[in-house]
Amino acid sequence: MLPRENRLSAEFDFRRLRREGRRYGSPFFNFFLISGQKGPARFGFVVSARVSKRAVRRNRLKRIMRAEVENLLPGIRPGLWGAFWVREAAERANHPALRQSVRGILQEAKALL
């Protein structure tokens, strides 16, 4: 599980990321990033009911993505805030494709050390 200090949870933080963050796209999600914040890197995950009506499937997508971010956390620059807005195509993706997409978008955003 992603440590509490590395989670974004406040609605205000997500709104700020959407408004001020740099957007990176993938077939499975949009990723918004703000750099230059104080403290450790923090991440959030948004999977709306539009992606899947079933909470079990939405939670599964969040778990897969959280696990990959947690694996990459030691190599992520501190002071970054990022949020993943999951798209409908992610529900049909398999684990390796989704995990590779998370890794790829973080590399594209130069979030990895």
Where are these regions (language model features)?
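Positively charged, solvent-exposed patches that mediate nucleic-acid binding
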Residues: 1-113
